[in-house]
Every structure is written in structure tokens, then in C-alpha cells.
């Protein structure tokens, strides 16, 4: 079993709502957690996220990392939100000591929408759950990538 915390937080940034997701204590599975309403610039958003992180670390077993969705177009070029996410990440890194990783979020909202459409017929319910579900996909991608990297390193050390 694990004797240390490997829990991670996933964030899907939006201009009106931010989706949050949490991993289990083993750092293997992501699940949607909640959506928070936000307004203001990157510093204000980072302050709201830092407050959520502090509350979470007090209530739970702590956090090992934060995976913040990094918006890019399919060809890899920046979107209209890329600079805002970079600014939020920079401000968040200044206010907390937990590593903040920018995680590629291409197609995460579409994947979340598709998954929610299979489970929930009511579009209002889907809309409520979309941001947190997108955050869970971003976080799961981060967790899977981290596991692949660990397996490669372990394979090299054999």
C-alpha cells in the first residue's frame, strides 16, 4: 500500500466557471469534484483556487500536485485562453507550495460532453456537470502520463 499522499487536483479553467476534480489517494483514478463560479482577472482566480486548495489540504490527506488544463488548438498553437491560463498558473504557483503542472486539455470538453450525454439525457444536468467532468479528464490524462513516465524510469533501472 501507499504510505504517502499522491492525491492530485485537476482544474478546468473557464471565464465563468472552473471545474475541479480529485484523484483517489493512490493517484490512479480521477473523479469530478465540483464547479466553482469565478470572476475577475488571473490574480483573483488564482486566489480563489488557492483558497480551495488550502481548504482541501486541511480537510483531506493533502495534495501532491495540481494539473491545470492547458488550452491549445489541435495543431498545438495557443487559443484565446492560453495566456489567461498561464497567468493563473503563475499566480497560483506564488500562493501555494504544491507543484502546478500545465496539462494538455485538447478535446477534454468534447470527451466530457460525450460521456455525460451517454449518462444524462437532461441537458441542464449535463451543463451542471460538464466543467468538473472536463477537469476529471484533464486530471486522468495527467495521472496516466505520470504512471507511464514512472514505468519507463522503472524499466530503465532494471
Label the model's feature ranges.
Residues 2-11, 15-158:
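Phosphate- and other anionic-substrate recognition elements at nucleic-acid/protein interfaces
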Amino acid at each position: 500500500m501507499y504510505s504517502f499522499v499522491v492525491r492530485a487536483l485537476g482544474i478546468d479553467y473557464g471565464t465563468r466557471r472552473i471545474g475541479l476534480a480529485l484523484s483517489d489517494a493512490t493517484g490512479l483514478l480521477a473523479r469530478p469534484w465540483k464547479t466553482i463560479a469565478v470572476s475577475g482577472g488571473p490574480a483573483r482566480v488564482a486566489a480563489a483556487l488557492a483558497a480551495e486548495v488550502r481548504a482541501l489540504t486541511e480537510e483531506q490527506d493533502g495534495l501532491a500536485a495540481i494539473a491545470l488544463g492547458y488550452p491549445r488548438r489541435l495543431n498545438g498553437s495557443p487559443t484565446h485562453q492560453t495566456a489567461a491560463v498561464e497567468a493563473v498558473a503563475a499566480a497560483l504557483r506564488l500562493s501555494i507550495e504544491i507543484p502546478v503542472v500545465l496539462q494538455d486539455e485538447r478535446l477534454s470538453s468534447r470527451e466530457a460532453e460525450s460521456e455525460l450525454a451517454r449518462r444524462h439525457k437532461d441537458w441542464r444536468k449535463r451543463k451542471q456537470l460538464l466543467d468538473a467532468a472536463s477537469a476529471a479528464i484533464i486530471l486522468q490524462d495527467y495521472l496516466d502520463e505520470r504512471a507511464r513516465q514512472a514505468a519507463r524510469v522503472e524499466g530503465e533501472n532494471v
